[in-house]
From Swiss-Prot:
Pfam families: FTHFS. This is Formate--tetrahydrofolate ligase. It comes from the Bacteria. InterPro entries: Formate_THF_ligase (IPR000559), Formate_THF_ligase_CS (IPR020628), P-loop_NTPase (IPR027417). The keyword Repeat does not apply. NCBIfam families: PRK13505.1 (NF010030). Belongs to the formate--tetrahydrofolate ligase family. GO terms for biological process: tetrahydrofolate interconversion. It comes from Streptococcus thermophilus (strain ATCC BAA-250 / LMG 18311).
Length: 556
C-alpha cells in the first residue's frame, strides 16, 4: 500500500480556479498562491454573506488513541462521497501546526485516498497564516516590552504579565525563559515563556472573527497584563490593535484547496482542542455554508473537547446550527478503552470492544443533550474483524444510533457512500433542535460544573486557591458571563489521561484560569495540560527529507 504522501503525489491536481467553479467562485474572487492554492476575497465573502446557509455536518470522535482516530480522513471522505451522490458539498477544516507535523503526527491533511491537496504545502507553510499569527503575537510582546522600557506609562506590573511569545514548533526548552537580560539598553529583565502558535489567543481570535472590524475589536480586547492596582491592561490601552490587524489582513481570508476527488476545501485556522476551542475559522465555515448545500466540518480530539466547544463557543457565531453530528470510532480505540494494551490492539477481542463501547455510548448521549441527531462512523482498519464489527453494530443498534462502516482511507469516495446516504437521511428528517449546554447568564462555576457533570460524567469540580481568587476577580471585571473553554487531556473524560472508558464519580480540579477576553472565552486549566508541547523520543522529522528536484519525502 502506498504511503499518504505517495498517494498525494500521484494525483494530478486540477487548477484551483477550475475546482471552485462548481460552488460559484470565479477567477476574480480568488487571490492565487500558485496554481493549486488560493485565498477567498472579502468581496466574494460579502457577496454571499446574506445567502441562506446550507446543511451543516459536524464530525467528531470518541476519546482517541495517541495516533488519532481519523476524523479528518472521515470528514474528507464523507464530503467526497456526498458530492458523488449528487449533493453539492464543501469541506471546512483546520490547517495543521508544524509542531505536531514535525513531532508525532508527521502530517495532518487526511490520509490514504481521503486527503486535501497539495498536502506537502498544507502541512508546511501553506499560505503563511501561521507565520502571520506568530508575527502578530510576538509583535504584541515586543510592543509591550517596549512600553515598559520607555517609561511604563500604564503602570504595568511586570510580575503580572500574562501574554507569552509563541513559535509554531514543539520546543519544551522555551516553556520558561527570561527576557531583557544584558543591561539597561536591552530592556528590563522579567520571566516570560513561549506557547505553540496554535495556543495563541490571536489564533482563537482569527478563527472567531467575522470580518476585519470584528478582528480589530477582538484584538483590542485582549488582556496582556495587570497594573500594580490589579486592574487589567488591554491591547487597546497600548493602542496597537490597528498594527496587529494590519499584520493579519491576509491571514483572516480563508484558504481554498481541493481533495483528491476535487471537492473544494476551505482550510483555515487551527487552534488545538485540548488547550483552545479546536475549530477552524467561523469565516471559512460560514462561507462554505452559503456556497454549498452541505458543509462538512470537524472539531478537534474527542467530542468531550472539540464538539462541546464547537457547540457552546463556535455555533453561536455561525449562521446556522449543526443538522447532524458524525462520531468517528475505531475498533482499536474501543479496545483500548476496554482495557487492551496498545501493543495488543491489532488482535481480535470482541469482549474488549463491548467493554470499551461505554466511551462511545457516553459521547452519543452527550451530543443528544445538545438536541442534534448522531451517526456513528466506524473508520475501518485492516486489523478489524467481522466479529468485532458485528458486535459494535449490535451495540449501536441497542442505543438506536445509526452506524456505518467507512473505508475512505483505502477506497476514497466509494468507501463513504453508505455513510453519506445515512447522513443525508438523518439530515433530511430534520430532527435537529440545537440547544447550548449552558447560558451566558450562568456563572463560570455553574458552566464548568455543567460541563464536568453533564459531559465528562464527573461528580464535582475542585477549584484550587488561585482559581478561586480568579473567579472573584473575573466577576469584578465582568468576565464571568463569558463561555468556558476547558483545557484538559484528550485521552479521557477525566483530567487523568489514564482513566479510560466512561469513568464516573471523579472530581475535576481547576488549577487556574486564563482570560481570553479578545477571543471571548475563559480557559480553565486542568491537570498538567501543556500550552507548549515537547517532541517525542523519535520525532517524525527524523524521517523527513527533500529530493534534488524539490519533492517532499516522509510526510506520512
Amino acid at each position: 500500500m502506498k504511503t499518504d504522501i505517495e498517494i498525494a503525489q500521484s494525483v494530478e491536481l486540477k487548477p484551483i480556479t477550475e475546482v471552485v467553479e462548481k460552488v460559484g467562485i470565479g477567477f476574480d474572487d480568488l487571490e492565487l498562491y500558485g496554481k493549486y492554492k488560493a485565498k477567498l476575497s472579502f468581496d466574494k465573502i460579502n457577496e454571499v454573506k446574506d445567502d441562506k446557509p446550507g446543511k451543516l455536518i459536524l464530525v467528531t470522535a470518541i476519546n482517541p488513541t495517541p495516533a488519532g482516530e481519523g476524523k479528518s480522513t472521515i470528514s474528507i471522505g464523507l464530503a467526497d462521497a456526498l458530492n458523488k451522490i449528487g449533493k453539492k458539498t464543501m469541506i471546512a477544516l483546520r490547517e495543521p501546526s508544524l509542531g505536531p507535523v514535525m513531532g508525532i503526527k508527521g502530517g495532518a491533511a487526511g490520509g490514504g485516498y481521503a486527503q486535501v491537496l497539495p498536502m506537502e504545502d498544507i502541512n508546511l507553510h501553506f499560505t503563511g497564516d501561521m507565520h502571520a499569527i506568530t508575527t502578530a503575537n510576538n509583535a504584541l510582546s515586543a510592543l509591550l516590552d517596549n512600553h515598559i522600557h520607555q517609561g511604563n506609562a500604564l503602570g504595568i506590573d511586570q510580575r503580572r504579565i500574562i501574554w507569552k511569545r509563541v513559535v509554531d514548533l514543539n520546543d519544551r526548552a522555551l516553556r520558561h525563559v527570561t527576557v531583557g537580560l544584558g543591561g539597561p539598553l536591552n530592556g528590563i529583565p522579567r520571566e516570560d515563556g513561549f506557547d505553540i502558535t496554535v495556543a495563541s489567543e490571536i489564533m482563537a481570535i482569527l478563527c472567531l472573527a467575522t470580518d476585519i472590524n470584528d478582528l480589530k475589536e477582538r484584538l483590542a480586547n485582549i488582556v496582556v497584563a495587570y497594573r500594580y492596582d490589579r486592574t487589567p491592561v488591554y491591547v487597546r490601552d497600548l493602542e496597537i490593535e490597528g498594527a496587529l490587524t494590519l499584520i493579519l489582513k491576509d491571514a483572516i481570508k480563508p484558504n481554498l484547496v481541493q481533495t483528491i476527488y476535487g471537492t473544494p476545501a476551505l482550510v483555515h485556522g487551527g487552534p488545538f482542542a485540548n488547550i483552545a476551542h479546536g475549530c477552524n475559522s467561523v469565516l471559512a465555515t460560514s462561507t462554505a455554508l452559503r456556497l454549498a448545500d452541505y458543509t462538512v466540518t470537524e472539531a478537534g480530539f474527542g467530542a468531550d473537547l472539540g464538539a462541546e466547544k464547537f457547540l457552546d463557543i463556535k455555533t453561536p457565531n455561525l449562521p446556522t446550527t449543526p443538522d447532524a453530528v458524525v462520531i468517528v470510532a475505531t475498533l482499536r480505540a474501543l479496545k483500548m478503552h476496554g482495557g487492551v494494551a496498545k501493543t495488543d490492539l491489532s488482535e481480535e477481542n470482541v469482549q474488549a470492544v463491548r467493554d470499551g463501547f461505554s466511551n462511545l455510548k457516553r459521547h452519543v448521549e452527550n451530543i443528544r443533550k445538545f438536541g442534534i441527531p448522531v451517526v456513528v462512523a466506524i473508520n475501518e482498519f485492516v486489523a478489524d474483524t467481522e466479529a468485532e464489527i458485528a458486535a459494535l453494530k449490535e451495540l449501536c443498534s441497542e442505543i438506536k444510533v445509526p452506524v456505518e462502516l467507512a473505508s475512505v482511507w483505502a477506497n476514497g469516495a466509494d468507501g463513504g457512500i453508505d455513510l453519506a446516504n445515512t447522513v443525508v437521511d438523518v439530515v433530511e428528517n430534520g430532527n435537529a433542535d440545537y440547544k447550548r449546554l449552558y447560558s451566558d447568564d450562568d456563572s463560570l462555576e455553574e458552566k464548568i460544573t455543567k460541563i464536568v457533570t453533564e459531559i465528562y460524567g464527573g461528580k464535582s469540580v475542585v477549584f484550587e486557591k488561585k482559581a478561586k481568587n480568579q473567579l472573584k476577580q473575573f466577576a469584578e471585571f465582568g468576565w464571568d458571563k463569558l463561555p468556558v473553554c476547558m483545557a484538559k487531556t484528550q485521552y479521557s473524560f477525566s483530567d487523568n489521561q489514564f482513566l479510560l472508558g466512561a469513568p464516573e464519580g471523579f472530581d475535576i480540579t481547576i488549577r487556574e484560569f486564563v482570560p481570553k477576553t479578545g477571543a471571548g472565552f475563559i480557559v480553565a486549566l486542568t491537570g498538567d495540560v501543556m500550552t507548549m508541547p515537547g517532541l517525542p523520543k523519535a520525532p517524525a522529522a527524523l524521517k523527513m527529507d527533500v529530493t534534488e528536484d524539490g519533492t517532499a519525502v516522509g510526510l506520512f
